[in-house]
């Protein structure tokens, strides 16, 4: 089916390929990626942009002896294809299938598990230093995007790397995008290198002087070949930032010119000390729809190749949050919105359009975003920081130090709480209830559905304290169960009365609990269902009344079992010496693999059927 790709099952297969053959292989790979991802979904645009770069890396270096560390890792599909996993792409990001990120247990060519941004330079530096201590001889390469290099961890790593002067290569894959358009001073700086390169200016002047006559065309081509050579030379005027750190800069380099890439990688391989190669790529290259809308094809569901159309989408929880925040801001000039490089993913692109002067995209910088929000709150603003649960982990100290100790009224809109599905371990939001539970002075809420989420956002305006609202990935939904009036701080809601057994559930697990009750009621088991709404504070009055009339207490949460909602209820029961049977249903204390969300709920025991089975066993015993 693919003339050149079908011959590749190992990096060894491309070692003797000519440049022309590698370019034809690149075309095959792009066709394969578009066809494959159209059937499974996945990260498309970023992988289309790194085809030539990945092939050049595997031609010049000897993986896995030479260590290639992929930042974030969503752009590692071509690497997986070259290292013998092409036939596994039918199961990409599916349960027990091929991961969308590097996995050490999947291939020896995957040097390190990654998933979050800005980590690769630190990891690669550690590998390089260990190599030096052991007096081993191999290359270490970090591949990082221009969005990721703005992250604090990446800058910290560059600071050390230049100082210790070890042999290492950093490849800066610059496509001017992270997921959305890049922002910030570093992004401007990198763009200025591209725009203002001394060599580019020189060749432009050559073109003008020669006026592109027939003779001029020949001389101009010669000048451009000369330019290509000079591109590899260090330019102190343009690249003083990297130079000042002690890291030698080469670039900008055409990331789609296979020969240029191979030449510069071979030179960098033998350079002493740290080297940074600034490679310019086009996100989505080779597929028109992805080139035109790279943000839409960053992470994409199944789509039609001919039209680029994905399956119809209903409104997401994130969009509902964005719409509600805009509505609140219409009548409150103090509301400001903050994102850490995820405006579309969090729904804040809507706020940006409505109130650009009250909207801040701080880049991949969750720590800074949290401290920044605290400063805004200090000076009278009402900041809302919308952030994925797994990314808020990076700002744990700032949540404590800058927000909660000082009781600043910052609201965290925690998106992607609970299991998220196909992205796996690094992206599940399964720890936030636990890590927020341990922090004083913060109110933590989780709505049963979209309408209750909006009511919780209304409540946030009335409270002058740190506050978090967590909600799941996926479509907006309405349970039409219970009351939808004004929410009172710390008050639970009884959705269904029953006897003997009470189920205390929070957030999206309310829906699962109600479905589990439908199963149990057919067997004569009739538990009381309580929508707890709050991790903290707890509704002590309702809990005392419930514990007097029920002998079995079940808690359900889409969070790790240790330290979260169940643990808080357990403590109340123990402290008040109630004699009841307790069952905590939650995510087991282990990292959860990737897969379809319903398969994962069943896998961890949080599907309605699994919940019903556990409660049945408790009641019968």
UniProtKB/Swiss-Prot annotation:
Gene3D superfamilies reported in the protein's UniProt record: 3.40.50.920, 3.40.50.970
UniProt cross-references to PROSITE patterns, sorted A to Z: TRANSKETOLASE_1, TRANSKETOLASE_2
Catalyzed chemical reaction(s): D-glyceraldehyde 3-phosphate + pyruvate + H(+) = 1-deoxy-D-xylulose 5-phosphate + CO2
E.C. no: 2.2.1.7
Short name of any one Pfam family annotated for the protein: Transketolase_C
Reported function: Catalyzes the acyloin condensation reaction between C atoms 2 and 3 of pyruvate and glyceraldehyde 3-phosphate to yield 1-deoxy-D-xylulose-5-phosphate (DXP).
Protein name: 1-deoxy-D-xylulose-5-phosphate synthase
Gene name in the database record: dxs
């Amino acid at each position: 089916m693919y003339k050149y790709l079908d011959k590749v099952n190992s990096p060894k297969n491309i070692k003797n390929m000519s440049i022309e053959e590698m370019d034809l292989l690149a075309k095959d790979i792009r066709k394969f990626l578009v066809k494959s991802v159209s059937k499974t979904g996945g990260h498309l645009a970023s992988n289309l942009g790194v085809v030539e770069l990945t092939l050049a890396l595997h031609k010049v270096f000897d993986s896995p002896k030479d260590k290639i560390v992929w930042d974030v890792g969503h752009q590692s599909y071509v690497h997986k294809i070259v290292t013998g996993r092409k036939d596994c792409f039918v199961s990409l990001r599916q349960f027990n299938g091929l991961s969308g990120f590097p996995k050490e247990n999947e291939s020896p060519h995957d040097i390190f598990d990654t998933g979050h941004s800005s980590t690769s330079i630190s990891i690669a530096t550690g590998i390089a230093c260990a190599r030096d201590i052991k007096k081993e001889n191999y290359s270490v390469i970090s591949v990082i995007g221009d969005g990721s290099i703005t992250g604090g961890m990446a800058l910290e790593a560059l600071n050390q790397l230049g100082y210790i002067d070890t042999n290492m290569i950093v490849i800066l894959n610059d496509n001017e995008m992270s997921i959305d358009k890049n922002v910030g001073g570093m992004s401007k700086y990198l763009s200025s290198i591209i725009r203002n390169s001394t060599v580019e200016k020189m060749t432009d002047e050559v073109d003008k002087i020669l006026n592109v006559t027939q003779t001029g065309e020949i001389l101009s081509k010669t000048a451009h070949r000369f330019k290509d050579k000079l591109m590899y030379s260090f330019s102190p005027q343009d690249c003083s930032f990297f130079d000042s750190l002690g890291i030698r800069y080469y670039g900008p380099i055409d990331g789609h010119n296979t020969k240029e890439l191979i030449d510069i990688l071979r030179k960098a391989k033998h350079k002493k000390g740290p080297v940074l190669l600034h490679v310019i790529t086009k996100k989505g290259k080779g597929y028109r729809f992805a080139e035109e809308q790279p943000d839409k094809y960053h992470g994409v569901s199944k789509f039609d190749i001919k039209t680029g159309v994905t399956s119809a989408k209903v409104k997401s929880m994130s969009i509902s949050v964005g719409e509600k925040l805009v509505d609140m801001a219409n009548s409150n000039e103090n509301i400001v919105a903050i994102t850490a490089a995820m405006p579309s993913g969090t729904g804040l692109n809507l706020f940006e359009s409505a109130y650009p002067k009250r909207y801040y995209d701080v880049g991949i910088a969750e720590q800074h975003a949290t401290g920044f929000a605290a400063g805004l709150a200090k000076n009278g603003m009402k900041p809302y920081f919308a952030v994925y649960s797994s990314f808020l982990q990076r700002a744990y100290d700032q949540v404590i130090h800058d927000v909660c100790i000082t009781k600043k009224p910052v609201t965290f809109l925690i998106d992607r709480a609970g299991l998220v599905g196909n992205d796996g371990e690094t992206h599940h939001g399964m720890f936030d209830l636990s890590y927020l539970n341990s922090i004083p002075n913060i109110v933590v809420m989780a709505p049963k559905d979209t309408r209750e989420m909006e009511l919780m956002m209304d409540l946030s305006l009335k409270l002058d304290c740190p506050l978090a609202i967590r909600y799941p990935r996926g479509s907006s939904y309405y349970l039409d169960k219970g009351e939808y009036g004004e929410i009172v701080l710390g008050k639970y809601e009884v959705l269904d009365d029953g006897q003997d057994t009470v189920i205390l559930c929070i957030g999206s697990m309310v829906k699962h609990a109600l479905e589990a009750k439908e199963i149990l009621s057919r067997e004569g088991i009739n538990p009381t269902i309580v929508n707890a709404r709050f991790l903290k504070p707890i509704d002590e009055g309702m809990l005392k009344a419930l514990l007097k009339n029920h002998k079995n207490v079940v808690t359900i949460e889409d969070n790790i079992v240790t330290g979260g909602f169940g643990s808080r209820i357990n403590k109340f029961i123990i402290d008040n010496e109630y004699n009841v049977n307790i069952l905590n249903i939650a995510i087991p204390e282990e990292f959860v693999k990737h897969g379809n969300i319903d398969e994962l709920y069943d896998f961890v025991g949080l599907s309605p059927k699994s919940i019903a089975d556990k409660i049945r066993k408790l009641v019968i015993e």
